[in-house]
């Protein structure tokens, strides 16, 4: 059981590190396709989402 908790803690820490790589840019949007060119310009990657009318880029 101790091994399970240890693996769970490691998984949570790795997930937090991965989530911290997201980049919000000050660009308004209504659909995710509007974020792609803005994210390519900002960080050089096309992976993006439109969340709460703001573009979120993923490196």
Curated annotation (Swiss-Prot):
The record marks 49 as: Basic residue of the functional dyad. GO terms for cellular component: extracellular region. SUPFAM superfamilies: Scorpion toxin-like. InterPro entries: Scorpion_toxin-like_sf, Scorpion_toxinS_K_inh. Residues 1-22 form the signal peptide. Expressed by the venom gland. One of its GO terms (molecular function) is ion channel inhibitor activity. Its main location: secreted. Pfam families: Toxin_2 (PF00451). Disulfide bonds join 29-50, 35-55, 39-57. It is found in: Secreted. The record marks 58 as: Aromatic residue of the functional dyad. Keywords: Disulfide bond, Ion channel impairing toxin, Neurotoxin, Potassium channel impairing toxin, Secreted, Signal, Toxin, Voltage-gated potassium channel impairing toxin. Potently blocks voltage-gated potassium channels (Kv). Belongs to the short scorpion toxin superfamily. Potassium channel inhibitor family. Alpha-KTx 04 subfamily. Has the structural arrangement of an alpha-helix connected to a beta-sheet by disulfide bonds (CSalpha/beta). This is Putative potassium channel toxin Ts22.
